Amino acid sequence: MMHSKKLTLGICLVLLIILIVGYVIMTKANGQNAQIKDTFNQTLKLYPTKNLDDFYDKEGFRDQEFKKGDKGTWIVNSGMNIQLKGGALKSREMVLYINRNTRTTKGYFIVGEITKDKKGYTHDKDKKGYTHDKDKKYPVKMEHNKIIPTKPIKDEKLKKEIENFKFFVQYGNFKDFKDYKNGDISYNPNVPSYSAKYQLSNDDYNIQQLRKRYDIPTKKAPELLLKGDGDLKGSSIGSKDLEFTFVQNKRENIYFTDSVEFTPSEDTSYESN
């Protein structure tokens, strides 16, 4: 009888320990997920910034990577990427380098065409396993919230496309991000990197805005993937990107990418060109 009581007590003790450990792990995971979501939310608060000139007066995260007196440079990038039925992956994107020191903005409109390497080699491949065949860059500047090509463009349609280009940060809105539910949130402390994925509906405001501006050849509602790397508390050498993926498979890919980053001015790729 005494042995039976000790056995029962031992089992209860083990179960109690398991419950406590499980609770601690769950609490830690929930806290980390909340921190990741809050980290993304700090960036998403920039959406919308309708007037790009406002970035001249916006302060971003600063650390020891910034030299004394450097006000920093904002890098904004938006692009639509479409590949249909095994054809080339075609992209149209723009990147601007908004220098707060000089209060000048330069960048490129990029028309890209990417095909798979038939032999499967890994040279010059991007993150989705494609090699870049044709990238045409058109230099631009931004003045008074207007995009201006800095070299003559004979194609009038292309010129208008560039001049009328709007970045996602100018019209996107994540005011309800804190209410997003059922996200797949992950964290890799070794890199470190972190991400959050959400299934959206076609009724989502941001999706309606994308469909209004782009001819998206699918009715499928996309997933929103938020990706970041660097210290969760903030890092000027880290990055945060968002991607709306409508279709992704071996033969067909349709996705929109966007990023807004704040970096030391001397580290911007445009300045080094």
Swiss-Prot record:
Main location as per UniProt: membrane
Covalent S-S links between cysteines: none
Entry protein name: Uncharacterized protein SAS2374
Keyword Membrane: yes
Cellular localization per UniProt: Cell membrane
GO cellular component, one term: plasma membrane
Species this protein is from: Staphylococcus aureus (strain MSSA476)
Protein family membership: Belongs to the staphylococcal tandem lipoprotein family.
Pfam families listed in its UniProt record: DUF576 (PF04507)
Membrane topology: Single-pass membrane protein
Record field: transmembrane: 7-27
